Each structure stands twice: as structure tokens, then as C-alpha cells.
Amino acid sequence: RENGIDSLAYYLARKLKNRTAAGYRAYLLRGLRQKSRQYPLYEYRLSYADYKEIREFPFFRLGRNIGGLYEREMVQRQKLFGSLASRTIGDIYNEIETGGLSKGKNGLELRYDTLLHGKPGYNSIVRVGGRWTNVVEEEPVDGLDIRTTIDLQIQDLTEKALVDKLQEADAASGVAVVMEVKTGEVKAISNMERIRPGVYAELRNHALADELEPGSTFKIASMMVALEDGICTPESPIDVGNGTYKFNGRTIRDHNAQSGGYGTITVAQSIWYSSNVSIAKIVLKGYANNPRKFIDGLHRTGIDADLNLDIAGAGHAKIRQPGDPQWSRMTLPWMSFGYEVQIPPINTLAFFNAIANNGRLMRPMFVKSILKNGKELRVYEPEVLIPEICSKRTLRAVQEMMYNVVNYQDPVGRRDGTGKPARSSVVSIAGKTGTAQIAASKAAHNLSFCGYFPYENPQYSCIVVISRPRRGIVSGGMMAGTVFKEIAEKVYSNQIRYDLSSMKPEASRTLMPPVKNGESRSAQAVVKWFDIRTTPKRVDADFSAFWRNATRDTLNVRKLTVREGMMPYVIGMGARDAVYALERCGLRVNLAGHGRVILQSVPSGQAVTRGQTIDIILN
């Protein structure tokens, strides 16, 4: 029927915006004349809210049998915070299975799929009193919820620090993971991969899946084994000569071989300076005639332990054994400084976390609890995999070496540790740099830094890996160490709790009290009581919502720009002001937490539509 088709075309054009009203009219008439059983109306996905609105358009409101509107249902995993821990959280398949349920595809969505998707209900159609009636045979059961260990603040700053460096270095991919030392809870995990110049996204869980040759971070495990077996002490001298060492016809080189090498140094300094020659000589001295003993020692450290992770597709650490087809006379020395082994970044982090945790190797945790309707059904406790990876004496020696990798300052100024770029005046950091040449290309490298902070009372461990950078200095310290430093400083600063009772007021002047972004007139009433200046001195009556910038003694006020169809910036606002600003744009708001807004689900300046729901997190 062509009757009323003009009205339908008008409504479709106004709603879908992919054709004009005239274009829709011609398209619909063409389908009508073809007399096809199926004729696609709109080839893109629609939200359920939009679909419900379209069902009420002319023709379609008459129902399926007369109006002829049919739909294909699909589901999509909505991630309110974009790429944050996206690959770890996981995805679901778009197709809907029998019973109206979807299925986990990867990440935690796949691992906990049977708990998350619930159970479908069943009904039958029976004839009652001359009418057909639906009878529920089995009620559907809602799926459970999981509470992850991810800290949104730490995750956000970790991802930003990583992406900034990847863009600066034009690197192929990068990993950054932050773990809580005492529990093994993963507080942040970012896996970013270049999809086009300057743009990075989470496509693969590199932190768990990539079985990499770790390079010099592995020297810590080699040193731990040698110290534990009494092969050397931290003070033992070792001659690395000019930075080259020939063994079985191949040459082992230090990074400074071209400038003459380190000469005679101590065993501890071989870690500070990351000497390949030194660690190879130590391992050959102790294990050349019994390599099995060295391999057994590595197993005891837990660096290749089965972590039994919650995420499907996680890789496994691989350490060659004497007698393996790939074992050669060069395997032992090359293994000592991180080649001919494959270690996923999460394993390296768990090992370094154990060093920070007084020798206890913790299982990395991604899930805290299982919930139903907000109530915890099961709480996951921290799990110790190895109570003691080495003796306390060896542990203290290794901890001190890692501290000096970052913080040792040569009085002459020529031999600072390789981790100097990670040195911080805000928080004390201990760690180890890693630079590993990728076998497939002599020009490509994986650059890493792994460690913990603060050194005196470790709270967090962290690993950063930058893969295949095209720009910048090929150095684990310069590339990954600087990212580690930024993460550590920001995480530590956010954790500081000041003792206000010990602070004395400054007698000479009044300091600006904390003022949130938002409505300014209330703030002005408070600061006026403190006799604090404001600019401008007066606020127009119609100015209701404002951004502010509080300096030491002045409250600066300017009008909040709220544009139709554009997401405003509400970071830093209190709940009332954020809701006010968003609702002025015609948006709906979901809030979580208390305090100031720290995250908004749609970035400021991005296009939004009236009625769209925005999620904000306060802390």
C-alpha cells in the first residue's frame, strides 16, 4: 500500500538521517514494487530505545503482520570507560543464542561466562477456556556480577602514560601492568597496539599472552640463583674488560663496549650497569659443568611458575632444559641475560612482585568477588604460590641491587645505573631495565622496566614494555623507565595521606580552601567569608554554572560553555554541579562514588544526543 508512505519516509529520514524523505520514499516504493518477502530498511545497528521509537512510526505501529517491520536482535558489550582494561574485561559474541543469551568471547567475559550469562526461561502455549495462553514453565535466572581488582584511577593514568610514550616513540605496541604487592591484585593493565599512525587500541592481551625474550630483566633471576648457590657475593670482583667476551666462537657484548667497557667491577655493579659479560661469566663459572643445577635454581625463583590466571589465552613461561633439541653450548650464557627463554610480562612482574613482597610469590588476581544483586556470594582471597623464592640474605642483596640500578650516583658522574631515567624525587623506586633484540629483526627491540615502589615499604609493583619503537633512544631506561616513573609518581601522590594536625597555618596570608569546579555563587559566598579575592568581582545573575581556577589567594571564575549536542567537561565537579551541567545538555546521568568527578564515560567535546545516558565516577 502506498497510502501514508510519505509520512513514514518523513519520520525515517528525520530519525535515521542516512537518506532524505524523498530518498526514503523512492526506496520504500522500490521495495514495495519488487514484492520481496524481505527488504532491508536500515543496514546499521540501532539501540533498543531507537527501535522502540521506530516501531511507533506510521505503518509499523500496526504490528508485524500488517506493518511488516521485523528486526534482527544483536548484543554488544558496552564499555563505559572506553579502552580502559578493555581486553582484560573481554567481549561477547554479537549473536544471540537460543534462549536469548549471549556468550563470552574473550577476557573475563569468557572465563566467567557461565556465571555471567544466567539461564533462560521456558514457556509453553496452552489452550485455556477457549483461548491460547502463555504458561511459564521455568523462570529465567539473571546472571551474576563480578567485581574486578582494577582501580579506575590507576588504570586511567597508566594507560595515558603508556599511550603518550607509544605515540612519542611511534612504537608498534606497549604493555603496562600495576600490581598490589601484598595481595597480587592487578590494579591496572593496559595493552595498546598501533592501528594507524598515532592511534592505539586494545587488540590483544600482550601482557598475558606474549612469550617474549625478556632481556636484561632476567638477570635478576640469574643473579638470585648464583647468590643462593654461593657462586659469588655482591662484593666479589669480576673483570669485564673492554665489554666483549668470546665464548665458543661467539662474542658477548656489553652496551658500552664501543667506549671501552667497565673493566673490573663488583658483582652488584654488574646489575647496576646491566653487564652481559659479567652475568654470563658468573653463570658459566658456577654452572658450565652442571647446567641442570642452574635451571633448577630458576624454577625455584618462580619466574616460570604456572600462575593459573583467570584469562583464557594466557601464555606460559618457557625455559629450555639440558637435552632439549634447541639446547646448545651457547644456551647457558645467553640465557643468563634473558635470551633463549620466553617469559610473558605478567610472569616477570609476578617474580619482581615477590622480591618486593619479602619473597612471597603471589598469584596475580583479576577478580575480587562474585555478586548477586549487590551482595557478595564469593570473595577471592590472595593466593601464595611460593612462600619463599630465596633466602632472606639473597633477597636483601637483590633488593639493594635493584635500588641502585635506579638511584646509584657515581661520584665521577660517568657510571650511574641504567635505571637513572626512572629516578624520582617523589617516590623511591627499585627495578631493572631490559633491552631485548627481537630475533626476526636486528633493528627491532622490546624495551622494558620492571620494579616496585616505594622502596622502603613496597605498595605496588609495575612492568612496562615498549615494542618496536621507531623513534628515540633504544634503552629500557629511557623508554620504559620514564613511563614507570610517571605511573609511580602519580599513583604514589594519589595515595598520600597528610597529617593535618602537624601542619601550622601560614600567618602572613590566607590560603585558598579546596573549591570544586561548578556553580560559582556558592563558592563565592564561602571565599568571601575568608576575605579572598574573586575575579570577576561580580557574577551576572544568569550565570549559574561555572568553571573555576583557584590560585593561592584568588578565585577565578568563568562561564561554563554548554553547547547543544556537545559533551561538557565535568571532571573535578561535585555531583550536584556535574548533574546540573549534563542535564542542561539534555543528558541522563548515572553516578557512582562520592567526592569529585574523576571519570566521564564520554570525553568533553564529543557529540552527544538528547536523552543519551552518561556515566560519571566520583572519588
PLM region descriptions:
Residues 21-34, 171-183, 238-242, 312-317, ...:
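Acidic/histidine-enriched alpha-helical segments
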Residues 64-70, 168, 586-596:
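Short, well-structured beta-strand/strand-turn elements
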Residues 1-2, 9-13, 36-45, 74, ...:
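Second-shell loop/turn segments in exported
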Residues 7-14, 23-141, 463-464, 482:
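Small/polar-residue-rich segments within soluble enzyme cores
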Residues 131-174:
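Conserved, well-ordered alpha-helix/loop/beta-strand core segments that scaffold catalytic motifs
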Residues 125-137, 150, 174-215, 224-469, ...:
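Beta-lactam-recognizing serine transpeptidase/beta-lactamase-like catalytic domain environment
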Residues 454-462, 466-505:
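C-terminal, active-site-flanking charged/polar segments
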Residues 319, 426, 486-619:
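Ligand-recognition elements built from short beta-strands and adjacent flexible loops
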